[in-house]
């Protein structure tokens, strides 16, 4: 792309020679940022220390607030990202108590512009990487970034004994970000919240000869399932993907790992979960599938919360952290990937609207538009986790039940693209004049859970 394009919601999109964006970390945040910046006409250099785009995980949900961004790609077609092998074709999200009584069935339709899709995480990352490569974006794997630098006019990194120069650096290097401390001057110690998470996804053939587990697959030819069970101090989600080709399950249980590990996720047998389920009336039903998890297919991690950073942008204004590097989430709100994608879209828009001579302004406006929204969702995710693990199904207070935090409308229905175009000038004025900026993408009362907020 060498000529200017136009955007009906903004000014002319500049040629790639006008701006070079270096992106460190090619997970969901980094790959989406690479694609969004490429769509604006910028030159993108993507760097990833791993040899490929594979990432551990089971199922990730991309709700309407992020899917509407991806839907703008490829002339409005999602065919390049979505196929039967990487999605869960569910018709309802079903919630149960520990006795197996269904408490809620939320109709689910992937074509609903608010609800979005459930993906196999590895499949989604592979699709994003493939699409970025098809666009001709310069993605470099197996590259270790050693340091970051900026001047008044440029920013860049030192990687594999090479100095790489651009107009700005976007660090999307995840929860264990090396860039965070360098760019923001902050590197807060994550707090262990006393919960251990387990997750797995494996070929459904592993349970094909287990009669007690066939309930998981009985409707697989027509639809996948997604069941969540909430008991005191333990929650379990189990279901299928790709029309029954895969079984996935995840569990969060209050407690602590006996050993501390440097890696954030460790292979582990499912035995601790099977032990927890022994006291559940519905436990044997769930254990029938979980017990057949193949060796090496279950992973455990201690859940740790990271407090909101005071700032995301470097002192010189040419480097920024996004995604988990800026605001990691506990898994309960299901918004980690979604907010990373929102970050990426807003980044591209702010660079476009600020212009190439105002890169520091662009990055600081990104922070203004995004910081309070993601900070509130971080807080709400912790509140949701307490509700899920308390499992107060019989409480007279609706706010205490596990159903209280499902699908908050202000989160899922948000259009960050329209919002960024509408609010850019107000946020830019706040940055330039040192004014307070009042965000319009969070509830006025500043609370995550809204009384009538569920979709």
From Swiss-Prot:
It catalyses: notoamide E + NADPH + O2 + H(+) = notoamide C + NADP(+) + H2O; notoamide E + NADPH + O2 + H(+) = notoamide D + NADP(+) + H2O. One of its GO terms (molecular function) is monooxygenase activity. Its EC number is 1.14.13.-. Pfam families: FAD_binding_3. Glycans are attached at residue 75. FAD binds at residues 48, 61, 121, 324, 337. It is a single-pass membrane protein. The chain crosses the membrane at residues 11-31. SUPFAM superfamilies: FAD/NAD(P)-binding domain (SSF51905). Pathway: Alkaloid biosynthesis. GO terms for biological process: alkaloid metabolic process; biosynthetic process. It is found in: Membrane. GO terms for cellular component: membrane. Notoamides have been shown to exhibit antitumoral activities. Notoamides A-C show moderate cytotoxicity against HeLa and L1210 cells with IC(50) values in the range of 22-52 mg/ml, but the IC(50) value of notoamide D is greater than 100 mg/ml. Moreover, notoamide C induces G2/M-cell cycle arrest at a concentration of 6.3 mg/ml. InterPro entries: FAD-bd, FAD-dep_Monooxygenase_BioMet, FAD/NAD-bd_sf. It is an enzyme of class 1 (oxidoreductase). The keyword Transcription regulation does not apply. Keywords: Alkaloid metabolism, FAD, Flavoprotein, Glycoprotein, Membrane, Monooxygenase, Oxidoreductase, Transmembrane, Transmembrane helix. The active site is at 199, 229. FAD-dependent monooxygenase; part of the gene cluster that mediates the biosynthesis of notoamide, a fungal indole alkaloid that belongs to a family of natural products containing a characteristic bicyclo[2.2.2]diazaoctane core. The first step of notoamide biosynthesis involves coupling of L-proline and L-tryptophan by the bimodular NRPS notE', to produce cyclo-L-tryptophan-L-proline called brevianamide F. Belongs to the paxM FAD-dependent monooxygenase family. This is Notoamide E oxidase notB'.
């Amino acid at each position: 792309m060498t000529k200017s394009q136009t955007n009906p919601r903004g000014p002319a999109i500049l040629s790639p020679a006008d701006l070079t964006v270096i992106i460190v970390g090619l997970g969901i945040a980094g790959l989406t940022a690479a694609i969004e910046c490429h769509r604006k006409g910028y030159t993108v250099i993507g760097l990833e220390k791993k040899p490929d785009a594979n990432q551990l995980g089971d199922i990730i949900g991309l709700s309407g607030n992020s899917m509407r961004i991806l839907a703008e790609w490829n002339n409005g077609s999602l065919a390049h990202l979505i196929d039967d092998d990487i999605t869960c074709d569910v018709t309802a999200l079903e919630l149960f108590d520990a006795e197996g009584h269904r408490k809620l069935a939320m109709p689910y339709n992937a074509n609903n512009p608010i609800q979005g899709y459930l993906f196999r995480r590895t499949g989604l990352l592979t699709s994003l990487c493939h699409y970025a490569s098809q666009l001709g974006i310069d993605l470099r794997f197996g590259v270790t970034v050693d340091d970051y630098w900026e001047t008044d006019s440029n920013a860049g990194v030192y990687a594999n004994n090479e100095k790489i120069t651009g107009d700005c650096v976007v660090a999307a290097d995840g929860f264990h970000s090396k860039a965070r401390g360098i760019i923001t001057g902050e590197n807060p110690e994550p707090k262990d919240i006393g919960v251990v998470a387990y997750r797995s996804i494996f070929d459904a053939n592993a349970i094909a000869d287990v009669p007690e587990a066939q309930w998981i697959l009985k409707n697989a030819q027509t639809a996948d399932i997604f069941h969540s069970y909430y008991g005191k101090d333990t929650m379990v989600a189990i279901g299928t993907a790709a029309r029954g080709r895969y079984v996935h399950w995840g569990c969060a249980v209050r407690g602590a790992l006996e050993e501390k590990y440097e890696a954030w996720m460790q292979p582990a047998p499912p035995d601790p979960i099977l032990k927890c389920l022994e006291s559940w009336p519905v436990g044997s039903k769930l254990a029938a599938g979980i017990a057949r998890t193949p060796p090496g297919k279950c992973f455990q991690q201690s859940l740790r919360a990271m407090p909101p950073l005071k700032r995301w942008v470097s002192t010189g204004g040419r480097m920024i952290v996004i995604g988990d590097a800026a605001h990691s989430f506990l898994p309960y709100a299901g918004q980690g990937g979604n907010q990373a994608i929102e970050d990426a879209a807003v980044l591209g828009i702010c660079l476009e609207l600020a212009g190439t001579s105002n890169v520091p302004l662009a990055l600081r406006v990104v922070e203004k538009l995004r910081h309070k929204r993601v900070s509130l969702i971080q807080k709400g995710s912790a509140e949701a986790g307490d509700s899920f693990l308390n499992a107060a199904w019989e409480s007279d207070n609706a706010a205490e039940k596990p159903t209280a935090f499902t699908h908050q409308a202000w989160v899922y229905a948000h259009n960050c693209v329209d919002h960024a175009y509408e609010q850019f000038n107000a946020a830019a004025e706040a940055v330039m004049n040192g004014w307070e900026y009042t965000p319009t993408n969070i509830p006025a009362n500043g609370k995550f859970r809204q009384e009538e907020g569920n979709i």
